[in-house]
Amino acid sequence: MAVTVTNQSNPLGSKIVQDTGATNSAVDNTTGGSGTLYMVEIDNSSYSTAVYFKLANTADATAGGASGTAATLVLFCPASSKRSYVFPEGIAFSAGFSHWCVTGAAEASTAAPATPPTVRYVTS
């Protein structure tokens, strides 16, 4: 899993977070603080099972399980597909951005994708 964050120049003033191997392990506080989410792209084109990308409004998440962090946002991507979700008005995250990816929609789901998708999201 490789996670990169790219700062964008004005007038955007935003960040692009890219995780080239999103798994069931939470990646915490990717942007280093609060912000607004504007777009998420999930590239699951190399995997034959659907995935659920989960984002939590926290700087310290625990992915899935009985004591897992509840996701603020859950986005579905079908098998062998790429999906983009755009939020023109943005979704505010006051505590930070933490994410993980699993094969089940349930909050307690912990099953990792056999082939992790690449996920990108744009924040301010």
Q: Locations of the language-model features?
A:
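C-terminal interaction-tip segments
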Residues: 2-32, 103-124
